[in-house]
Amino acid sequence: MKKLLKKSKFWWFLLCGLSVSTILVACSTPTNSALQTVFSPTSTNFFHGQKGSLKEGLITALKTPSANKHFVIGPLLKALEAWYENNEDKAINKFLKDTKKNVDDQYKNTVNGLISPPRNRAVFIQQDLLDKSGGSEASWKSQQLFNQLISDFTAKLFAKDFLVYKPNGQLSTGPYIYDELSQPEKWKDFGFQEPRFSETNDALFAKLQAQIFNLWVEYTDPTLISQATFKYAAPQQGLGQVYNTEKLKDKLTPSYAFPFFPKDGEIPQNQNVGNKRWEQLIEGKDGLNTAKTGLEKYILDQNQGNLIDFPTTLSDNTQTKQIVDSLNIVDQLEAANLGASLNLKLDLLNQDKDQLPTIKELNKELNNTIVVESTKIENHTKSNTLFCEHNTTDSSQNNLKSLIKDAFISSNDSSNLGKLAKQIHQTTTSDMMVSTKASSSTTSSYLVWDAAIPNNKTNNGASTVSANCANATVQNTSHNSNNQLKLRLVRNGEGVAVIGIDGGSYYLTKNSSSKTERDIEKQKQFLMWRAFQAKTNTFKNSLYSFSFPLNETLKTWFEKNQELILVNALINTDFQKKDKGSDAMQKAFNDYKELMQKFAPVALATNVIRDLFLQMDALDNKLTSRTTELNTNVNQINPTPWLNGLSSHLPYVRKSGHYEKLNNYFLFLITKTLWKKVGSEKINISENNNKLKTTKADVDKIRDEILSDINNKVTEFVNQLKVTEKSKPNFSNIILVDINNDQSLTNSANWSLNALLDVTTVNPLSFALLKNAFTSNQQFEKAKKLFEEIKSKNGSSSTSSSSDADSLAKVISNYYYMTWSKLTNKAMYGNPNNGNIDELFKKAFLESVDESGFNVNFKAVIDHYRFIFTLQWLIENNLKNFKDILQANLKYGEIAYIAYDKNIISNNTNNPQGIFGSVFNYENDEHATTANANQTIDPNNFFFKTKTSPNTTPATTMLSTRQAVSTSNNGTYGFTGLNTTNSSMLENNTNQALLNHIAANSLKQYGSKDDLKKFISETKDQLVLDNIARQLSRLTPSSSSSNGKTLSAYFQVDAINNSALDFKAKQALLLAVLDQYSSYFNSSNSPSISKRSTQTNQKFSEFNFGGDSYNYLQFTKSDIDSLSLTSSTNIESDIVAALVLFQASDTGTQQLALSAIEKPQFRIGDKRIQSGLNLLK
């Protein structure tokens, strides 16, 4: 966006007072230019002030996920070195020696690779190499050594799988009998142990694997998903019996959009696939729970472990189980399976979840299962099912919805799909239509689901084919459900799946408050049994098998946080059976064990909590991203909705951009498992009526409380350390800390600090310093108070204002919009409620400047501080500074105007370019858009607004035909601010055309006629006179001259092309003819605008250019003095407020405002802090 004032060079006030001076070193050999790079500290802390102390810096590092893991590296390196050095395996001893030599060689090669004159090499070795690795050659080598040792140790640690069965504590080597091992009372006998004939180090690796497994289960809630899948397929005669092959062409393949399951008669006798398998599955064929019927036969009772097993022979996908955990479930599962799995987890945990429909009777045909007669399904709502309905009351027919018929042919098939296809096909030829609005008078024949809950009943219905009527809603029905199974039916990209959580309720229990929670010990036992079963192929019979690669899974988990996981494992490992290597490792680690016990669990929990919050965002993105192509097909200029076929929304409601109920699963783990690692759960904040709160606002409060607990824990830990400044090496630019006079801890702390103060990103310490510079300034506190007042007001519709804050509040959404417009995903905060898109702007802004959270946008916060400081500076003393800027930059006679893009005013702005989806609501947003996509409006540059609405009639050549402005409750979008020759939001051609149009129709830029006469009389500039004459020449005189003089004489030349008139004569001529143009000024008998303080309601005109239309109001230098935020004079106060907001966001204006205050003198002890400040420009 262009502002009126522009500066080519951005003034960085906060660096004033900072200096980088040369360190004078006696007999120094580096060149002066090299020494210029050495930072001269002015503080022994990171920066002067409590937040810049050494302890505060370390606290910040140890509570930051990207930095905290480095603090355990020193103790781990001690332990690993001892293990490698004392190991009984000589190859391991040799690896340590070779690695140390490699590190030495690596250091030499790195140093020799520095391109620098020899005399400067010491400077750049220190700054470019050692400062990044703890400050010394020894710390650099230690860091490199650790990286290579931990990589090798990880490979050795997971080279073997040490999961075993130990009945009565005795290692069993088999044979393993399913009927014995499948009994839950046996599961406690599984564990990790070296084999009888073990190799050196096997005992240690087995113990560490056990601890890593324990951490994995506790911190991530591993879940084994059981599933049977039935894939779509085409019948022998092709999909053309139902779908429109002429319209769909090569897009028509068996898929989620065009589902089909061949009938039994179309499946070869020797193939047991599709409908054949489905019929056998719902009958419970080969199920292990022989006391039950139907699908329940695949679910063992609670006392049998609640195991869920599907025979591989009854699934088109032979992999009938999948292991996931809370940190990879979003990435591992397809969107439909993901939603269903999380919904089922929440059901088992007795937490709030989205309601799914229940299928009372499972049909033996898959086609008649995904398309269900409404009488055979209950708990269906507009958010969880789709259907086709009779609608004789709604005469407005949406073509995009009716076009869905083009996906089908008119079928007379007696099946559900045939009837559904026929019904859709009749949409545009009768009173049948696809509707997105529920009505109590409507009825539905068929319902289509993407996820549903099965009851354990079967139906012997005839063989049929299926479909889905896209995105209509259903009438609620009320039935008593019985015998609901803890399973989910899912319609996904592959086919239809039956999903269950294996052992799901077995390892759940009720706590003292009767709340459901995990029994982590039972969960460990269950998972070990299943992993051992897969490892040893201990299945009931050949019909059952699955894969559970535990070792590979543990390694993947380990590598995500290997430093913190390993140190936590060492803390909990019992070294009873010790070889020399393990004994040495234990002794080396024991020196730090007590200290690590206080820190490592908190650090690991902090990182996992952060990752779980990130999983919430990932879930929202995954479920929303599936709709991109669907919406494109509907929203493009030439829509092709039939290509979406039977695609629909998932039955999980999105609120404010978040799938709140599904995200409740991650919140459950955060609050019920991990919060206790860093503090204690505050039930009054996290729960309501014994259920977790799910709104975004409540989740943020929970997050903030947890972050406060983390800060307290880390602060308590650091306060137990002796933190002092370590002597600085020559030429170093950084502060080094010493911890407890211990080299390992000292290295660890400095590695953590270096990760925190990464010079490529804005660091929290630089932010804290800069924030303090603002908050300690009285003017800023005044500015902050003003903005809080603006934010708290609702911006009433009246254009009259009693305070500056009132006017600014009416247009503050323009400032919020500047944040929203930069978003790649503009629907990340959901769809607007009742078209109130301003609420989304505000959400985007508030989140961008939120100073809580794990990923604070420091740059956005500081930019906001500059803005509000500048805003206060502009408005004080009745807009004095704002007016001074305008006076300095708008010359007398220069044309300027305020304009609105009328194309935006007149267009539907509810869904620009389809950013809020489509009328089909594939996102299942609580505020479904009812507007078709407007492809002519760019959401990145039109949403500036005012309360004032410039209603006009088409203009004649004179400006006197303009109508007064009016006001609107919601305001008017399309506001383009103040436009001049050098600055405009409009395209250059449009801006120039409008300037030319004004020049050809107005002399208002000169104020009154008397003002211009005075100016002409006083000027000494020939070019100024020529410019005025040219402007007058473009106008038609409104009266004839009584003295016979005309403007044409001004341009007369003699025989040699010199002007016929001299300067004085030209002045006199212009003064003489000016009365002929009186109608182009304000009334010559009235005082100039600058003196008419009571003049109100200036009027807008209409201008058309290139097929587009604009409403504009000419603005002149004489308008400036009467501008006000509290009274509407020549320009409405809310328009003035919008102009002030634009000016406050201009970086050049911010420079000017900040230069008016006393510049802070920063005392900094570490160049990395200065680097962080530079990134905050």
Curated annotation (Swiss-Prot):
Annotated transmembrane regions: none
Q: How does it sit in the membrane?
A: Lipid-anchor
Put simply, this protein is called Uncharacterized lipoprotein MG307
Record keywords, A-Z = Cell membrane, Lipoprotein, Membrane, Palmitate, Signal
**Covalently attached lipid (S-diacylglycerol cysteine), positions:** 27
Pfam families attached here?
Answer: DUF3713 (PF12506)
Q: Which family does it belong to?
A: Belongs to the MG307/MG309/MG338 family.
Where is the protein localized? Cell membrane
Report one GO cellular component.
plasma membrane
Q: What is the first-listed, main subcellular location in coarse terms?
A: membrane
Locate the lipid attachment (N-palmitoyl cysteine). Answer: 27
Q: Secretion signal: which residues?
A: 1-26
